Amino acid sequence: MLSGGKKNNADVTDTVKDQVYKSKDELKKQWGNNYENNLKKIEEAVSKTAGQVLTYDGKPISASFFSTSNGRTENAADYWGNDYPYLKSVDSPWDQASPKFTSEQTFTVADFQKRLGVKVLADGKVGNIKDLTEGKRVKDVAFQGKTLTGKEVREKLDLRSSDFTWKQQGDKIIVTTKGFGHGVGMSQYGANGMAAEGKKYTDIVAHYYKGVEIKTMNDYEGKLMVKK
C-alpha cells in the first residue's frame, strides 16, 4: 500500500506484497506439534494490545514490516519514493541470527540480461553499483547505457533484498543478498531478537517506528469513518 500500487483493483492482497494470510489448516501443517502453543501466543498478543493504535502526529501510521534486515532498516523514501517521518533507517543487529540473513541465487548470463534488459561485458564486469542508500542497500546500478535502481533490480530478478553483490563465473552470474524483504519499518527477526533480550513491545515499536505514540481506539471514537 505504501508503494501506491494496486493488484486486481484491491488495496491489500494476501501475499508478501501486503500481508500473508494462512488458514488454520495451513498453520497446523506448517507448525505441526507447535500449533497450539504458537496460536496461544498470537491470541495472547492480540488480546493484550486490543484497541491500541500506533500514531504519528496524532494520526494512525502505516506500520510496514518485513522478515529480515541486512543489519539496518531502510528509509521509506529510498525504497518507495514516498517519505514517512517515522519510517527511517535504524540499526537492527539482531537479524544476523536469522536463517534468511544471507542467500545466493544463480542466473545464466542470458537470463540475467533478458530480465534486466542490459548487456554484460565480456570482461566479467556485470554492472557498476554507483550508490548505496542510508540502509546500506543498492541505490543505483549503471550498465552500458542504462541505469537501474536497486529496487528495480531486486524486482526484476526476484531477489530477497536490494542489498546485493554479484560475480560472473563463466556463463553464470551469482548474486549474493543480505536480508529478506523491502527493509522498511519493523524487522520481524529484529523484533524477535529484541524480545529475546527482554525488551517490551513498546520498546520494539519505538525503535523501529521513530517518534510514534501508542493511542487507544477510544481516542478516535467518532473521528474514524469507513470509506465507501
What are these model-predicted stretches?
Residues 1-172:
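Extended substrate/cofactor- or partner-recognition/assembly subdomains adjacent to catalytic sites
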Residues 144-228:
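C-terminal soluble interaction/assembly domains
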